[in-house]
Amino acid sequence: MATLETTFAGLKLKNPIIISSSGLTDSAAKNQKLYEAGAGAIVLKSLFEEQIMMEADWLGDPNMYPEGSDYLVGYIREHKLGEYLNLIKETKKVCDIPVIASINCYQDADWIEFARKIEEAGADALEVNILALQTDIQYAYGSFEQRHIDILSHIRKTVNIPVIMKLGDNLTNPIALIDQLYANGAAAVVMFNRFYQPDIDIEKMAQSAGSVFSTDADLSKSLRWIGIASAAVSKLDYAASGGIHAPEGVVKAILAGASAVEICSALYQNSYAIIEEYVRFLNAWMERKGMENISQFKGMLNVSDLN
């Protein structure tokens, strides 16, 4: 039988199937079921900086003194952070696989201290999402990319656990950014995060939400950029996210240069049983191709081997 073990961000995974951050990973009970279903690692549901600020705005009084507003924001933040740290601790008790915490932030101020608390709570790694649409006409070129580097650099000075950067696809030069992320201590990069999709209802003549799920067509973006990045910045680990809707997608991602894949939409649309299906398919494919371990074919079809 082939060996499906892989290393991602310095973590040893029994297989390359990582459960992406979502509502599927927001409780220890759910995470235990994913672990029992065969997942290689779990990324906990993200804690969103903007959600904390929005909740504080919703509960606040516009006529409140600044001191009162600051207290409310601080109270809500501490409450949410406390809940999240408990999620880490409880999940670690029931899951004997890597548990990766996740934060979604657009500034680095208070998240640096929180990263330290995440490590103390027992998280095996931290995934950082800096997903934002830049719509300010005055926003300087390159500022968004520099924000990634600044936040990563500050977090790396605070924690010893691996820091994983999950990127959006709205970057001008992903390879240049990835090279700088590696230089500043990133252990791995996930490609790509996914924006909520907009739509328009022509009967109501109103904006509406698009599909919340990815499709298999989304995988091509990850294959392209992981194929390029894994050749250009080869010492980093990569994971493909978005579009893994069939077990063949796992093989494709590894051939492109990924060490692992993150899945979410396929679990929502099917069941936890697909984890075992993906693992079985990968094992059968490797045996059919005479592959004894994942390193034998990882990156076999990245750009360096196609030129």
Predicted feature descriptions by range:
Residues 1-18, 84-92:
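N-terminal amphipathic alpha-helix/helix-capping segment at the start of soluble metabolic enzymes
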Residues 12-18, 71-74, 162-163:
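Short, basic, glycine/proline-bearing loop/turn elements
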Residues 251, 256-292, 296:
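Shared catalytic-loop signature of beta/alpha-barrel
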Residues 64-70, 74, 219, 227, ...:
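Extended, intrinsically disordered, low-complexity segments
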Residues 24, 108, 267-268:
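Short strand->helix junction
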Residues 28-66, 82-89, 93-100, 104-240, ...:
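Alpha/beta enzyme core
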Residues 14, 25-30:
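Short N-terminal binding/cap micro-motifs at the start of the first secondary-structure element
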